[in-house]
């Protein structure tokens, strides 16, 4: 391929702390009334002093460790100075010179995407426009609730080789965030926000375009689409011999294009300097170690364990570990059923027909004991697998036990050999031509007789018993 994209991501993760980064206001503000979770600190009133959140640091360290970063014992906050209506202080408290962590990576499909740094900072407020398109808005309102909500900003190296890989990186990162419990990772709620930097290399001339920043992408799909569009735009400009401007562009959902927003800022535009109201935060290696020891099992580790301990295929383990809730519920069921493979089959073929991997499995009406009872009914021959699927659906919807459902619906397998034989004898008498054809070698007609019994018993006959009796009566 002549033209190759070079992509790096800047990802802002809202941390699930109880309070904001530097004050005691609640951090979970998504559903609150506008401007109801604010105080003199997060709105930048004169004389109000910030105090860093310990929980913010703990969550940041867990995230940095999960992303294989070197965690720095010495960190310091700085002021990033710029004007925007949703930034009441006129500056943002961030970590520019001495970040929390450096030099990490996230492994994706066997390839390492390097992480340059992770730093802690505070969020800005939120502008609410009178129109979905800012260019068409007649007015804008400011909600300061989000001011001071703690963020971890993750900056990757430009190692991402395609828009699809960028999407996959974000999906895997969100999975890790949710396993750690440090963030919901909900893009639609602003808990995970991504800006992308893209340039394009012409491999024939070894010429590389200027870097373009792309913003306003509020879903993984839109990140991929925006980068696909921008790659084509830059590539076409290079083919035409035009210079690609170094700028910030925004994804326009209505036109499925990017539009120019402003020229790209440089670091010196922000006039960074040390935050005078917060002393440096110095952590000992022992303190960092104690926090890292709280690390839960991560998705890749859990997947490997499922394959090893439960003898699952990579495909099965991938799906069952796609969310922590699903993986935990699977293990709860295996503990009761003592049958990992059968439990996996029912999760993949039945449970996930009704639930997504991100569901709250603690709230399901179907419980681990129901899986065991269902498997026992199948293994004892009281119900067939087809009937079991019907039973499963009813248990899932109502929370009744499988035995109750079987009794109420009267769908226990008919294992009475004399009844099955009676039905088959009548069929043989009514279909002498098919009996003769079968005896002359058309063995596929066995299915006709077995199917007839199943139809008359409404699927309740034991197929194994039906097969045996049919073959005996047909002379096999």
Swiss-Prot record:
It comes from the Bacteria. The keyword ATP-binding applies. The keyword Nucleotide-binding applies. Keywords: ATP-binding, Ligase, Nucleotide-binding, Protein biosynthesis. GO terms for biological process: glutaminyl-tRNAGln biosynthesis via transamidation; translation. It catalyses: L-glutamyl-tRNA(Gln) + L-glutamine + ATP + H2O = L-glutaminyl-tRNA(Gln) + L-glutamate + ADP + phosphate + H(+); L-aspartyl-tRNA(Asn) + L-glutamine + ATP + H2O = L-asparaginyl-tRNA(Asn) + L-glutamate + ADP + phosphate + 2 H(+). HAMAP family: GatB. Allows the formation of correctly charged Asn-tRNA(Asn) or Gln-tRNA(Gln) through the transamidation of misacylated Asp-tRNA(Asn) or Glu-tRNA(Gln) in organisms which lack either or both of asparaginyl-tRNA or glutaminyl-tRNA synthetases. The reaction takes place in the presence of glutamine and ATP through an activated phospho-Asp-tRNA(Asn) or phospho-Glu-tRNA(Gln). Heterotrimer of A, B and C subunits. This is Aspartyl/glutamyl-tRNA(Asn/Gln) amidotransferase subunit B. It comes from Thermosipho africanus (strain TCF52B). The gene is gatB.
């Amino acid at each position: 391929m002549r033209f190759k994209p070079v992509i790096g991501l800047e990802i802002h993760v809202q941390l699930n702390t109880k309070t904001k980064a530097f004050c005691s206001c609640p951090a979970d503000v998504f559903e609150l009334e506008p401007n109801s979770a604010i105080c003199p600190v997060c709105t930048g009133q004169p004389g109000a002093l910030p105090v860093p959140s310990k929980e913010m640091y703990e969550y940041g360290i867990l995230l940095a460790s999960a992303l294989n970063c070197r965690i720095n014992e010495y960190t310091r906050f700085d002021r990033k100075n710029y004007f925007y209506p949703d930034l009441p202080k006129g500056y943002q408290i961030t970590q520019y010179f001495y970040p929390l962590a450096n030099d990490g990576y996230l492994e994706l499909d066997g390839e390492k995407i390097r992480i340059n740094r992770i730093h802690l900072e505070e969020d800005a407020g939120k502008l609410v426009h009178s129109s979905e398109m800012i260019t068409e808005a007649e007015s804008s309102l400011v909600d300061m609730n989000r001011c001071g909500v703690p963020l971890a900003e993750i900056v990757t190296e430009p190692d991402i080789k395609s828009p699809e890989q960028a999407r996959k990186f974000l999906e895997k990162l969100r999975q890790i965030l949710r396993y750690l419990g440090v963030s919901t990772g909900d893009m639609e709620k602003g808990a995970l926000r991504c800006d992308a930097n893209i340039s394009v290399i012409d491999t024939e001339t070894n010429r590389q375009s200027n870097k373009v920043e792309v913003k306003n992408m509020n879903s993984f799909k839109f990140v991929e689409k925006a980068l696909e569009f921008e790659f084509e735009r830059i590539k076409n400009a290079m083919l035409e011999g035009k210079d690609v401007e170094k700028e910030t562009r925004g994804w326009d959902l209505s036109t499925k294009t990017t539009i120019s927003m402003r020229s790209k800022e440089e670091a010196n535009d922000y006039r960074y300097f040390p935050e005078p109201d917060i002393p440096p935060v110095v952590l000992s290696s022992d303190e960092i170690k104690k926090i890292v020891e709280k690390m839960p099992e991560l998705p890749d580790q859990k997947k490997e364990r499922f394959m090893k301990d439960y003898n699952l295929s990579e495909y099965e383990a991938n799906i069952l570990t796609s969310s922590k809730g699903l993986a935990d519920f699977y293990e709860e069921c295996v503990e009761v059923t003592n049958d990992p493979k059968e439990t996996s089959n029912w999760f993949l073929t039945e449970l996930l027909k009704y639930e997504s991997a991100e569901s709250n499995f603690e709230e399901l009406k179907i419980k681990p004991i129901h899986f065991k009872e269902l498997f026992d009914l199948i293994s004892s021959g009281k119900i067939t697998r087809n009937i079991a699927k019907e039973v499963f659906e009813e248990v899932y919807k109502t929370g009744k036990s499988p035995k109750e459902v079987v009794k109420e619906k009267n769908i226990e397998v008919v294992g009475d050999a004399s009844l099955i034989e009676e039905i088959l004898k009548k069929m043989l008498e009514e279909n002498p031509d098919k009996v003769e054809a079968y005896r002359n070698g058309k063995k596929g007609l066995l299915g006709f007789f077995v199917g007839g019994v199943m139809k008359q018993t409404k699927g309740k006959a034991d197929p194994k018993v039906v097969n045996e009796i049919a073959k005996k009566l047909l002379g096999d």
